[in-house]
Amino acid sequence: MSTNPYSAEELNKRLDRVNGWINNCDQKSGILLAFGGAFVAVLLTSDVIGKGYYYLIEPFYSFWLDGVDATFSLKRATLFCGLLPTIYYGLNMVYNLLLVLKPKTKIEDFNDDSSPITNNSKLHFQSIAKKSYREFQIESKVQTESAYLDDLCTQIYCNSKICDDKFENYKKGLDDFTKTLICCFGEIVIYFIFPAHPTNPVE
């Protein structure tokens, strides 16, 4: 026996699947943000930032602004240059992951005038909240089955667009996260593997 693809049961299953993907993306983004927050917390509670400033930033700062003589090395210059993309990719990661968690709830945002989007939805929470309880109750009672199915289709479409945007931003955030780790690993390798300049008193 074939299943009607435009039945309330089938459409509700599709909506549940899309909502499941949205929750999955939100959870992944939350995990990455939590990991990034924990990493920053470790840096703030240790002396890494202080040592990094003293070793990388302070000599350039003193030389450029105060005219203080400073001895530079290839190692220090390389670490300083590597710090810039690390910060850039880290901030970009946070930005993209926050876009994942940013709510996008207005049905009007998805109406491109090419499809019959149901703006006066009986399922969408914002459309319901704009009405009084009595208005919502009356409109729900007189809603036809065809209108209800169209309303379900609208929710599936809008949630699918939301889900697609979320995963696009999540992929960007994950890519920035990977680049940040690579930059951090490169900084660690350069700092511990390459010898310090013998004539540099700071090193």
Regions found by a protein language model. Give the residues of each.
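Short, charged/polar, low-complexity loop and linker segments
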Residues: 1-16, 137-145
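Alpha-helical transmembrane segments and their immediate juxtamembrane boundary regions
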Residues: 6, 13-16, 20-109, 167-203
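A short amphipathic helical element positioned immediately N-terminal to and/or at the very start
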Residues: 10-13, 159-163
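Membrane-proximal soluble regions of multi-pass membrane proteins
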Residues: 101-161
